[in-house]
Regions:
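Hydrophobic residue at the +6 position relative to the catalytic HRD Asp in the kinase catalytic loop
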Residues: 50, 173-174
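N-terminal lobe of the biotin/lipoate ligase/transferase fold
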Residues: 1-160, 180-182, 189, 232
Length: 319
């Protein structure tokens, strides 16, 4: 692929490719057929050779890393066709000593997960399934701040790359027109006073069609394609996302949670509104005051008291 891409619009003879790759002409033909089966459009002409006409929407580490210019995120990138869960692979890599900034991407997942262990539908070749390994010098109590970092990065990139008006939902969703377009799942490896690693997991619906969503979804869902009416190449989206995560991560460590919290709250439509929080065993009503430093949602209750919300589904009351 690299050889053909280095000569766009040009024909390379089978002999040139054979010599460059140190393989037989028969092996060249087999490689070309394999690439065609994977979606690469490769023209062939007698006495001229092969020419790459178009690429499938594949995520390749070399393409993502080329001129990425990040400080931490993307130092190492693993792109896999199919796996159980990008978060699981990233956690295993973290335990084995992988460097901060490792990114694990998959074309599909067989065991993608959301918050509270809920299944995350992960069809092949249409979405972004990504995990970023970080080793922040933060207290474990501050680890939830990274969930809001993921949300802000995802929402801002959806606006800038896709022309959407993305909003955030506490604690870990990104919405467009009231429908869920991305979910976030961060997983922590820590002791009482030290974070060993933190994995940022992001599932972003890019080119998913309406019939690919399960019928039993808890909340309405959407994708970039459904919102814009056109397919979106995933490469520019993932590159922009990794750059924004890197930028926000650097700012968080240098400036604290305040600036990031303000960017998140600016996209949170329930700020200063009356809501109810369904915690399963009880429903709490109040007015949203904002986020605490540990990511808890703070409510003003009807009796004037303030209460921190650590878990629950938040819904607006009235308009």
């Amino acid at each position: 692929v690299r050889l053909l891409r280095a000569h766009p619009g040009e024909y390379l003879s089978g002999q040139e490719i054979s010599t460059s790759l140190k393989i037989s002409r028969a092996a060249v033909w087999k490689h070309v057929e394999h690439l065609r089966a994977a979606g690469f459009e490769i023209a062939a002409r007698r006495a001229q050779g092969y020419c790459l006409r178009s690429l499938p929407d594949l995520l390749l580490a070399d393409d993502i890393m080329r001129d990425l210019a990040t400080k931490v995120v993307g130092r190492e990138i693993d792109c896999l066709k199919q796996l159980s869960s990008t978060n699981l692979i990233a956690r295993e890599a973290a335990a084995a000593g992988a460097p901060e900034g490792l990114v694990v991407l998959a074309d599909s997942q067989s065991a993608g997960r959301g918050r509270l262990g809920r299944n995350w539908t992960s069809p092949e070749g249409v979405n972004l399934y990504a995990s970023v390994l970080l080793r922040p010098q933060l207290s474990p109590l501050d680890a939830p701040q990274l969930t809001f970092l993921s949300a802000v990065a995802t929402a801002e990139v959806l606006d800038e790359v896709c022309g959407l008006n993305a909003r955030v939902k506490w604690p870990n969703d990104v919405l467009v027109n009231g429908r869920k377009i991305a979910g976030l799942l961060n997983e922590l490896g820590a002791e009482t006073e030290q974070i060993h690693f933190l994995v940022l997991g992001i599932g972003l619906n890019v080119n998913m069609s309406a019939d690919q969503f399960p019928a039993d979804l808890r909340y309405p869902a959407t994708s970039v394609m459904l919102e814009t009416g056109t397919t979106q190449a995933r490469l520019p989206l993932v590159r922009a996302l990794l750059r924004r995560i890197d930028e926000l991560y650097h700012d968080l460590l240098a400036e604290g949670f305040g600036p990031l919290r303000r960017r998140w709250e600016a996209r949170f439509d329930l700020l200063d509104r009356q809501v109810e929080v369904d915690q399963g065993q009880q429903i709490i009503t109040g007015v949203v005051a904002g986020l605490d430093a540990d990511g808890a949602l703070r409510l003003f209750l009807p009796d004037g008291r303030s209460q921190r919300i650590l878990v629950g589904d938040v819904r607006p009351i009235g308009r």
